[in-house]
C-alpha cells in the first residue's frame, strides 16, 4: 500500500516549479480552455528534475545518475522526459529519455498548439533511455521507439511480463554518453 501527496504552491521566485509541486495545465501551457490567453510555453521548464535516487515502482526500476550527469540536467544541458504506451490500454512499454539540449532548445518558447512541443522534443538529440518493454519486443522495435542503437538487457521485471533495458545512442556526445553509462540501475518489485 503506497501513499503519496502532492502539494500546490505558487512561488514568487519567478514562478519556478518546485519538486513535488502540481502544475496546472494553464501553467504548463496545455490548457484546453478556449478563453486561455497563454498560447506559448517554455518546454525546458517542464523536464523531469534531478533527484538523489529515482524510484519508479510502476516500472519496477530504481536508479541513480552520476553527480556530473545530474549537474548537466540542472544546467539544462540534458532534458529528462518520459514516454509510455497509451494509458487506456495494457502497458506495452514505458521508459525515461535523456536528451541533449542546445542553448536554443533550452531557451525555446513554443506554441502549445500546432505541434510546437512535439517539434521541440523531436529536435532533441537522444543520449539514452532506461525502461521496460513487453517481453519478446524485438530490439529493432526498441531501437525505433527509443531512438537508440545499443541496448543492454538489465533483467526481467518482478512480474516477469517485461524486459528491462538500458539503451544508448552511440552517436551521442562522448562525454555525455560516458557519464550516462555510470548510471546505477536496480530492478525492484513492480507495483
Name every feature range the model reports, one short phrase each:
Residues 4-7:
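C-terminal motif of bacterial Sec signal peptides marking the signal peptidase cleavage site
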Residues 10-65:
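N-terminal, intrinsically disordered, polar/charged segments of Gram-positive cell-envelope systems
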Residues 59-127:
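Secretory pathway targeting signatures of secreted, lumenal, and periplasmic proteins
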Residues 84, 99-101, 133-136, 167-172:
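Short, flexible beta-strand-to-coil junctions
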Residues 121-125, 130, 139-144:
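Surface-exposed helix/loop patches within compact recognition domains
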Residues 142-158:
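Short, surface-exposed beta-strand/loop micro-motifs that present aromatic residues
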Residues 157-191:
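Surface-exposed amphipathic alpha-helical segments
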Amino acid at each position: 500500500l503506497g501513499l503519496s501527496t502532492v502539494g500546490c504552491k505558487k512561488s514568487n521566485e519567478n514562478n519556478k516549479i518546485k519538486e513535488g509541486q502540481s502544475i496546472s495545465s494553464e501553467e504548463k501551457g496545455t490548457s484546453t480552455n478556449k478563453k486561455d490567453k497563454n498560447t506559448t510555453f517554455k518546454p525546458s521548464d517542464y523536464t523531469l528534475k534531478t533527484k538523489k535516487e529515482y524510484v519508479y515502482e510502476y516500472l519496477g526500476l530504481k536508479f541513480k545518475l552520476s553527480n556530473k550527469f545530474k549537474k548537466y540536467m540542472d544546467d539544462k544541458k540534458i532534458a529528462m522526459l518520459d514516454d509510455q504506451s497509451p494509458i487506456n490500454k495494457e502497458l506495452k512499454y514505458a521508459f525515461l529519455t535523456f536528451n541533449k539540449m542546445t542553448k536554443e532548445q533550452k531557451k525555446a518558447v513554443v506554441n502549445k498548439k500546432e505541434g510546437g512541443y512535439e517539434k521541440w522534443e523531436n529536435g532533441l538529440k537522444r543520449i539514452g533511455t532506461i525502461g521496460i518493454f513487453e517481453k519478446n519486443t524485438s530490439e529493432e522495435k526498441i531501437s525505433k521507439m527509443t531512438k537508440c542503437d545499443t541496448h543492454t538487457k538489465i533483467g526481467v521485471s518482478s512480474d516477469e511480463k517485461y524486459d528491462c533495458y538500458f539503451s544508448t545512442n552511440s552517436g551521442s556526445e562522448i562525454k555525455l554518453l560516458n557519464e550516462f553509462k555510470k548510471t546505477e540501475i536496480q530492478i525492484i518489485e513492480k507495483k
